[in-house]
Amino acid sequence: MENVRFSIIENDLKWNSESDPTADVDLLLDKRSISSEANSAGVFSDEAHEIFARQQQNQILWDLDEVKETLTESPGGKHVVDMVQSGCFLELMTDSADCNLALICCSVFGSVENTLFLLKHYNADPNVADSRGRTPLHFACCRANAPIAKVLLDFGADPNRWDARKEVTSLHCAASSKSVECILLLLRRKASINIGIEKRSALHYAIDVNAVDCVEILLKYGADPNTPQVYTETPLHTASAAGFAKCVQLLLSHNADVRSQFGEGKVTALHLAAENDYVECARLLLEHRAEVDCRNASHQTPLHLACLSQSIGTVDLLISYGANVNAVYRDGRTALHAAIVKQSRSLDCCNALLKAGADVNKADNYGYTPLHIAALNEFSSCVYTFIEHGADITARTDGRVSALSFIVRRTPEIIPKLMQKLDSSIKANDQEIGDVDCQIKLDFRLLVPSSSMDRGETELLLSLIEVGQKRILMHPLCETFLFLKWRRIRKFFLMSLAYHTLFVILFTFYVIWVYVRCCKKEELCVAPGYVSTIGYLVIILNLILLGKEVFQMAHGLRGYAKYWENWLQWTIGTGVLLCVTPETVRTDDLTAVPVWQHHVAAIVILLVWLELMMLVGRFPIFGVYVQMFTKVAVNFAKFLLAYICLLVAFGLSFAVLFNDYPAFENITWSFLKSITMMSGELEFEDIFYGDYAVKFPVTAHIIFLSFVLLVTVILTNLMVGLAVSDIQGLQVSATLDRLVRQAELVSRLESLFFSRLLRSAPTNLIQLCKRSALLRTSRDKLQFTIRPNDPRDNQLPEDIKLNVYKLVAERRDRNQSLRRRQFENNYNIFSRSLQRQQQPLHTDFLKPEPATGTTKKTPQNLFHMHELLRPRSATNVPQQFRQEAEGTVQMKNQANVLSAVLAEVQAIKTQLVDLVAKFERFSENATRKLNYSTDELCRLRQQGQSVASSHIRRHR
């Protein structure tokens, strides 16, 4: 079995570090596996990792400690660095190289006055470089020190000079330091804006640090957003990989090429944005006509990378822009295969893809469907989602391993859910379950996946048998399906049975005439002439049977070899050819038949009739009894093997004690005689009182008595009791075995009609056979309706109909019990609430004291308040339900009480409405009276004031 890819769908993808993105870059580049559960960033391509590593390096172009260490290692560097930091240049000689080193130090440590002093008075070289080719202008721009950069440029510093590694110029340094002033200063001094564009220009460095203003200035002054070489990193790649949406927008507004590819992986900007879940960047790229299904070197689309990294936001965006959800990449995998990476987010991606129409049964080049991968990784939620969307659980890999096999071993919790789906496939109409008009509809579409229509209709049942879940065949849906299938192929089986019956009868007649008929020695033994004709007919029929076996073997040798009936058929065919030979076909002298042919004929005639019994046992009406016989025979053989040593012991002992007796003269005959004596055929008188005297009387009597007690009494009864101890269980087991054999028989017959060996046969004949064998020719018609209470409905046997009826009745009773329990809970809560509302509210203890105006909080009042505010309990539910009749009466009484309560509530509501209306009228009258009183008081006040003023004037 193919366990090579267990829990591995992308074994060449890289991990993302859980730590800060600025740390452990080497580890980020080296680890290869699937993203873990704890990692939420997804998986990255090689190109994305390359961009990430370069961005970490360019965030701090040159570390200050590293620069200081480089300057100190120069000749006299430590002394010069100390002088620059102290600002004293008295010991600096004009003809010494120290002045150039001091100029570099001044550009590093940011001293404008000292820089100008060195350039004017010491004639320092503005283009001097350290051991790594870095000039003072490099350091000034890297430190974003525009004044020093201006001074250096005024004294002739070269703005386009490279460092020793040909990696950066002063413009690169200014862009990396986010210095707009330095960039403008350099551009005004004729700095080449596209210098280094073959690898990485200043625009790349500005994007590395997300310097939006610098990017805008560079683009405004003519920076090229594209690169002249193919498969090189463009600024758009850099911005998309980092998720800098504003930079992406600026680049796109300046005609950046959205189709350009980068690196050996040939990834586009949309690939980089999709695999890192930068939704805004992806949206901008798609709005500017980026190809939604563009492919990289591995034939992956952005949707594949988004699913691999579990970028659900980007997945939804790409689907909304028409991404092909069924596009395949390496090894024939689809986006649905790629989405099964980690369980925490796989379900969201899978749901989005399935909603967009992803093919849930699409297999990769190894035969693995998404259901296989989900089951292997033990993602039960994804497994159930796939099954809900029509995934074929019978789909097999190239190693012939079904998805159901993975489900049973890796996600066994799906099996009960599968049983629930089988239950839900049997539905009844709205009629009462005991009504004659009650109809039950059985939907077989779950048993016949859409992808298996070209392989027959019993593939699921065979898969259940294969993985050890054959008890599911006893489900009413499966049992009904098997019965209907049997009814469809019954005609083919009857033809086969008739053919075998004819063959057995002719062969039996031939054996009787050739091998059984007794002739006197002095007479010539001659058979009738038609016996030779029968012999030739037997040979022809036998060759046809062997041809059928050859066809079945060519159809599938592995499946053919595992059925013992096929080996029995080859044994019979070979034996018949040995029995019906030219010597036996001649009827003039039957005494010339060799003795060995009599032995062969005796064995073959037994096997022929045994095979006919097994064929008859395939009928449902006889199958249980034949299976019970087979089961008991197998059990009896096991027990006989367990006690074979005891029988051998007694056989040898009898051979020693009774060697004169004919049955015990030979050890072989002695053993066979011991087995015969188990059935009770002891022959005590013949052995002890016959013609032969017992040589060892005492020992012989003891051994014989021991045999009678241990074997005839104990062992025989024990074996019979163990073999048939549980008749009811034996019937159930036999019924299950019958269903298994019936399913295998139907499947084998169907497989012959769909065999590739019949492609050259007439098409009309094959289609006729298929229509005769298949239950329905259309998937939408895989439904069957019965009326269990209608005596005229005889479509199904009574036992199957009863099982279907029980399942529907139990489910309906269970639902009614749940509804009844919910009603009782709601009614109890409502009745208690109503009682609390009708209970008078005790507010005496809330009245304030006459003197203090505060509430008197006594222990009695507090207890009473607690009782009033205590929440109503909803747990007073009866533990045991009443009988059905009592429950119905109680529900009617409760409904009457509820109606009365609702009427009282309506009356109270009407009274409250009247009270509210009266209160509103009272408040309006009170308001008018209050306004009138206020006006009168104002008028009286004015009148009093006028009277008082006139009185004062008169008094004066």
Swiss-Prot record:
Looking up PROSITE patterns in the UniProt record yields: ANK_REP_REGION, ANK_REPEAT
Q: Which residues lie on this side of the membrane: Extracellular?
A: 513-525, 585-601, 660-701
Q: Which GO terms describe its cellular component?
A: cation channel complex; membrane
Sugar attachment sites: N666
What is known about the tissue distribution of this protein? Expressed in various peripheral nerves and the central nerves in embryos. In adults, it is expressed in sensory neurons lying beneath the bristles around eyes, neurons innervating the bristles on the back of thorax and neurons in maxillary palps, proboscis and antennae. Expressed in multidendritic neurons, which mediate temperature sensing, as well as non-multidendritic neurons in larval epidermis. Localizes ubiquitously throughout neurites.
> Which Gene Ontology molecular function entries are recorded, alphabetically?
calcium channel activity; monoatomic cation channel activity
Q: Which loops or segments lie on the Cytoplasmic side of the membrane, by the record? A: 1-491, 547-565, 623-638, 723-956
Q: Which domain of life is it from?
A: Eukaryota
Q: How does it sit in the membrane?
A: Multi-pass membrane protein
The residues bearing each ANK repeat, given as ranges, are 132-161, 166-195, 198-227, 231-260, 265-294, 298-327, 331-362, 366-395
The protein's location, in the record's own words, is:
Membrane
Gene Ontology biological-process entries: calcium ion transport; monoatomic cation transport; negative gravitaxis; potassium ion transport; response to heat
Which keywords describe this protein according to UniProt? ANK repeat, Glycoprotein, Ion channel, Ion transport, Membrane, Repeat, Sensory transduction, Transmembrane, Transmembrane helix, Transport
- List the transmembrane segments: 492-512, 526-546, 566-584, 602-622, 639-659, 702-722
Stored InterPro entries: Ankyrin_rpt, Ankyrin_rpt-contain_sf, Ion_trans_dom, TRP_cation_channel
Q: Which residues form the signal peptide?
A: none
Assembly notes:
Homooligomer; between isoform A and isoform B.
Role description: Receptor-activated non-selective cation channel involved in protection or tolerance from high temperature stress. Activated by temperatures above 40 degrees Celsius. More permeable to K(+) than to Na(+). May act in stress protection allow flies to survive in natural environments.
Protein family per UniProt: Belongs to the transient receptor (TC 1.A.4) family. STrpC subfamily.
Q: Can you say what this protein is called?
A: Transient receptor potential channel pyrexia
Species of origin: Drosophila melanogaster
Q: Which gene encodes it?
A: pyx
